[in-house]
């Protein structure tokens, strides 16, 4: 982690008092809950931290590396979009004790993660407490150089801060921010002492935060009772007196101005402010679209620039969405088009599937084909038929690619989601290789010695757990994938078992390593003589299996009826115990990974693989090829990730 950079606090210098004014409408809600202290009511129980302002590329593994330097981390979860799996920019870090959380906020708050300062706060699960306006203040006219850290340091002198945020966009600070204090008294003190002061040579306004709903209601009320009128398309030869006389007949005017340039020439627009709203409304109704000295006037309520831009943005988005909806499912994207093809020849190829509304091959400025284009049909059914018939068709000995057209941002999100999934898989494989707890999907560790025989129709009862895995039925803490523990961390009260190497111990299997500790009982006591040891071969002969036990109850001879009585997790465990020995017979070194990949198949197909050895062998070979191909393609990325410099923090 990069070293923590603490911006110098904005210097507060007294300035002459400024009249209290209504705060400008804020585009963002204030951040809440970010700070150094918690409410006393939560002090004893809360160990969960909210970490915000994260770069989308930040993963659970990166956060664990950072926060584990402070104390024992129970779990980490980066919140992601349910569809694209793209990071939402915030995460939750759970410590085992509150003291570690306190230290994490003191030492890591506003520190840089991927060159972006993070914001850390205690997780507040009660939305009523998160949205309360008590102790929340609004600051505007901030200098562009003031960031979250500088704002926090400036206002920390008045009380415990629960939240501190400067509103920003892609270009930087928006010039306003929010500070949420623990008490209303601290907020009042901050308003009293800082309102009208100079921060970085700019006079700031500090007042109580007004919730968005109240601000919006006040704005709507102001718009409905407007008195300021805007007029454009005014003839350049019109004088100020003529312009004012035009509006005087509608009521008393408090101000009237016709905008002019530096040379004194009229810009063709101006503003008229009436004393009464009804008079202003009457002027708009009668003068809009009227003729004045040969020009058709445009007269309407005067708007702020930000309001006009917002209306234009909304209208643009509405037109854009309407256009996208119109072509949704009917516009096709084509690539690998032969250079000899033109628009007409391409249209002839796709005409048999329906009515084409447009067909175009994209070309360079020189007129040379760029090899891709678009075909738009009148109905989705026609487009789907064209995709199924034309995708992969050979045109001039070149396979044509045909698919539904997608927007660039949608394609980018899908690509980012795919890259993120590959990175997660690589991190899980690295974690498995380094003993960082049991990996997520794609790796399978059998129970040592498998499960002993169970009565007919009963699901297995797990007695032992592999390294980093809790027995079934216990809650799993989130870390990347559900149930995965970071960096070998184990829940308190569980002892990790040694993961199996190669195939499960059986007759002729690998012997325990030199210096291995002797077998122990469940509670660590020496195992009584004669008691079977998990993972060791059972005695041969009639005593190896209880008398009268049906063969179908043995692992490897599972039935659909037995699996139907088990939960999905138990079904996978039962099938894994049956499949693993068969995979290990041919691939002892990769049995765990290959079994994990095979277990992703549906249960019905897994039962078929247990019955048909040839089908299982074919599936093992297929999984082996996929694994080798992935390892070859991903080796460069794994090496870069391993060599990445670890960021450092300082208090």
Swiss-Prot record:
<dbReference type="GO" id="GO:0005856">
    <property type="term" value="C:cytoskeleton"/>
</dbReference>
<dbReference type="GO" id="GO:0006417">
    <property type="term" value="P:regulation of translation"/>
</dbReference>
<feature type="domain" description="RRM 1">
    <location>
        <begin position="47"/>
        <end position="125"/>
    </location>
</feature>
<dbReference type="InterPro" id="IPR012677">
    <property type="entry name" value="Nucleotide-bd_a/b_plait_sf"/>
</dbReference>
<feature type="compositionally biased region" description="Pro residues">
    <location>
        <begin position="529"/>
        <end position="540"/>
    </location>
</feature>
<feature type="compositionally biased region" description="Low complexity">
    <location>
        <begin position="1"/>
        <end position="27"/>
    </location>
</feature>
<feature type="region of interest" description="Disordered">
    <location>
        <begin position="1"/>
        <end position="42"/>
    </location>
</feature>
<dbReference type="GO" id="GO:0051028">
    <property type="term" value="P:mRNA transport"/>
</dbReference>
<keyword id="KW-0813">Transport</keyword>
<feature type="domain" description="RRM 2">
    <location>
        <begin position="135"/>
        <end position="211"/>
    </location>
</feature>
<comment type="subunit">
    <text>Part of large ribonucleoprotein complexes (mRNPs) containing RNA-binding proteins RRM4 and PAB1, endosome-binding protein UPA1, core scaffold protein UPA2 and associated factor GRP1. Interacts (via PABC domain) with UPA1 (via PAM2 domain). Interacts (via PABC domain) with UPA2 (via PAM2 domains).</text>
</comment>
<dbReference type="InterPro" id="IPR035979">
    <property type="entry name" value="RBD_domain_sf"/>
</dbReference>
<feature type="region of interest" description="Disordered">
    <location>
        <begin position="632"/>
        <end position="651"/>
    </location>
</feature>
<dbReference type="InterPro" id="IPR006515">
    <property type="entry name" value="PABP_1234"/>
</dbReference>
<dbReference type="InterPro" id="IPR045305">
    <property type="entry name" value="RRM2_I_PABPs"/>
</dbReference>
<dbReference type="GO" id="GO:0003730">
    <property type="term" value="F:mRNA 3'-UTR binding"/>
</dbReference>
<dbReference type="InterPro" id="IPR002004">
    <property type="entry name" value="PABP_HYD_C"/>
</dbReference>
<keyword id="KW-0509">mRNA transport</keyword>
<dbReference type="Pfam" id="PF00076">
    <property type="entry name" value="RRM_1"/>
</dbReference>
<feature type="domain" description="RRM 3">
    <location>
        <begin position="227"/>
        <end position="304"/>
    </location>
</feature>
<protein>
    <recommendedName>
        <fullName>Polyadenylate-binding protein 1</fullName>
    </recommendedName>
</protein>
<dbReference type="GO" id="GO:0008143">
    <property type="term" value="F:poly(A) binding"/>
</dbReference>
<dbReference type="GO" id="GO:0008266">
    <property type="term" value="F:poly(U) RNA binding"/>
</dbReference>
<comment type="function">
    <text>RNA-binding protein involved in the formation of polar-growing hyphae which is essential for infection by the plant pathogen. Component of endosomal mRNA transport that regulates polarity of the infectious hyphae by transporting a broad spectrum of cargo mRNAs from the nucleus to cell poles.</text>
</comment>
<comment type="similarity">
    <text>Belongs to the polyadenylate-binding protein type-1 family.</text>
</comment>
<keyword id="KW-0677">Repeat</keyword>
<dbReference type="Pfam" id="PF00658">
    <property type="entry name" value="MLLE"/>
</dbReference>
<feature type="region of interest" description="Disordered">
    <location>
        <begin position="481"/>
        <end position="554"/>
    </location>
</feature>
<dbReference type="InterPro" id="IPR036053">
    <property type="entry name" value="PABP-dom"/>
</dbReference>
<dbReference type="GO" id="GO:1990904">
    <property type="term" value="C:ribonucleoprotein complex"/>
</dbReference>
<keyword id="KW-0694">RNA-binding</keyword>
<dbReference type="GO" id="GO:0005768">
    <property type="term" value="C:endosome"/>
</dbReference>
<keyword id="KW-0206">Cytoskeleton</keyword>
<feature type="domain" description="PABC">
    <location>
        <begin position="555"/>
        <end position="632"/>
    </location>
</feature>
<keyword id="KW-0967">Endosome</keyword>
<dbReference type="InterPro" id="IPR003954">
    <property type="entry name" value="RRM_dom_euk"/>
</dbReference>
<feature type="domain" description="RRM 4">
    <location>
        <begin position="330"/>
        <end position="407"/>
    </location>
</feature>
<keyword id="KW-0963">Cytoplasm</keyword>
<dbReference type="GO" id="GO:0005829">
    <property type="term" value="C:cytosol"/>
</dbReference>
<dbReference type="GO" id="GO:0005634">
    <property type="term" value="C:nucleus"/>
</dbReference>
<dbReference type="InterPro" id="IPR034364">
    <property type="entry name" value="PABP_RRM1"/>
</dbReference>
<keyword id="KW-0810">Translation regulation</keyword>
């Amino acid at each position: 982690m990069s070293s923590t950079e603490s911006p110098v606090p904005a210097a507060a210098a007294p300035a002459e008092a400024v009249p209290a004014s209504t705060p400008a409408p804020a585009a963002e809600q204030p951040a809440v809950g970010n700070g150094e202290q918690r409410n006393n009511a939560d002090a004893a129980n809360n160990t969960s931290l909210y970490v915000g302002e994260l770069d989308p590329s930040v993963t659970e593994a990166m956060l664990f590396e950072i926060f584990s330097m402070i104390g024992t981390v129970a779990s980490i979860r980066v919140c992601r979009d349910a569809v694209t799996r793209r990071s939402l920019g915030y995460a939750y870090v759970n410590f085992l004790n509150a003291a570690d959380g306190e230290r994490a906020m003191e030492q890591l708050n506003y520190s840089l993660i991927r060159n972006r300062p993070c914001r850390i706060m205690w997780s507040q699960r009660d939305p009523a407490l998160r949205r309360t306006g008590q102790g929340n203040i609004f600051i505007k006219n901030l200098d562009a150089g003031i960031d979250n850290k500088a704002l926090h340091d400036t206002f920390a002198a008045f009380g415990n801060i629960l939240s501190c945020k400067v509103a920003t966009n892609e270009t930087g600070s928006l010039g306003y921010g929010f500070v949420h204090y623990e008490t209303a008294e601290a907020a009042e003190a901050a308003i009293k002492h800082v309102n009208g002061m100079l921060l970085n040579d700019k006079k700031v306004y500090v007042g109580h935060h007004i919730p968005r709903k109240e601000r919006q209601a006040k704005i709507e009320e102001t718009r409905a009772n407007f008195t300021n009128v805007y007029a454009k398309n005014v003839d350049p030869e019109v004088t100020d007196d003529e312009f004012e006389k035009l509006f005087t007949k509608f009521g008393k005017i408090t101000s009237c101005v016709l905008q002019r340039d530096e040379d004194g020439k009229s810009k063709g627009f101006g503003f008229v402010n009436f004393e009464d709203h009804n008079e202003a409304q009457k002027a708009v109704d009668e003068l809009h679209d009227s003729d004045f000295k040969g020009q058709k006037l445009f007269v309407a309520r005067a708007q702020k620039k930000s309001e006009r831009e917002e209306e234009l943005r909304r209208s643009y988005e509405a037109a854009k969405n309407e256009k996208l909806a119109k072509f949704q499912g009917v516009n096709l994207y084509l690539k690998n088009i032969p250079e000899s093809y033109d628009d007409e020849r391409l249209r002839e190829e796709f005409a048999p599937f329906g009515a084409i509304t447009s067909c175009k091959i994209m070309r360079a400025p020189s007129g040379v084909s760029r090899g891709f284009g678009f075909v738009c049909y009148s109905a989705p059914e026609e487009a789907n038929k064209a995709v199924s018939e034309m995708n992969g068709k050979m045109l001039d000995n070149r396979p044509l690619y045909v698919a539904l057209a997608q927007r660039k941002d949608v394609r980018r999100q899908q690509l980012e989601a795919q890259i993120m999934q590959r990175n997660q898989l690589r991190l899980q494989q690295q974690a498995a290789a380094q003993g960082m707890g049991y990996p997520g999907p794609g790796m399978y560790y059998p129970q040592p010695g498998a499960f002993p025989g169970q009565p007919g129709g009963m699901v297995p009862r797990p007695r032992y757990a592999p390294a980093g895995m809790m027995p079934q039925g216990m809650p799993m803490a989130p870390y990347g994938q559900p149930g995965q523990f970071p960096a070998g961390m184990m829940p308190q009260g569980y002892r990790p078992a040694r993961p199996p190497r190669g195939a499960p111990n059986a007759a002729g299997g690998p012997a325990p390593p030199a210096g291995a500790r002797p077998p122990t009982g469940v509670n660590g006591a020496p195992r009584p003589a004669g008691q079977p040891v998990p993972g060791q071969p059972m005695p041969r002969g009639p005593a190896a299996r209880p008398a009268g036990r049906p063969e179908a109850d043995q692992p490897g001879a599972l039935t659909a009826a037995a699996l139907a009585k088990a939960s999905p997790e138990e079904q996978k465990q039962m099938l894994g115990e049956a499949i693993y020995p068969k995979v290990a017979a041919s691939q002892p070194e990769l049995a765990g990974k290959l079994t994990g990949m095979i277990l992703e198949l549906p249960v019905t197909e897994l039962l078929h693989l247990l019955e048909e050895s040839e089908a299982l062998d074919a599936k093992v070979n297929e999984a082996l090829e996929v694994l080798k191909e992935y390892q070859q393609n991903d080796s460069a990325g794994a090496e870069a990730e391993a060599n990445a410099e670890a960021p450092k923090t300082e208090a």
